[in-house]
Amino acid sequence: MFTGIITDIGRIEAAEQKGDLRLRIGCGYDLSGVDLGASIACSGVCLTVVDKGDDWFAVDVSAETVSRTASDRWREGARLNLERSLRLGDEFGGHIVTGHIDGTAEIIGLAPHGGSNRIGLRVAGELGRSIAPKGSIALDGVSLTVNDV
């Protein structure tokens, strides 16, 4: 489980097709406390750490995950919003984010609104009916409150 509060921005250092897509992601996390098998949200997608070094970790991205996300995201040099999994006792500042992707959205507008920004999104098909005013969504792993539908 995650909160949608981004704690680092990583960069894909290498991408290699090994059955699944193996990514090596450079990051600023102290990975000494990250076990193999731990979950890290990569732009909102819950992925499992399969290897690691001092300043990088590796994950395998399934074809199903690639097909349900913005597929150009999974390329060498791409930046990813990162969040370690929620631990008991951590501050809970966003909303519950599972990291299981339901679909994608197209950004159709971006405008300043007071001290923040208003983002217009177009969501295809069934997913749009699941979004409620004043509910929450995660966009690239970032917790956002829905103002209106």
Per-range role (PLM):
Residues 1-149:
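Conserved loop->alpha-helix
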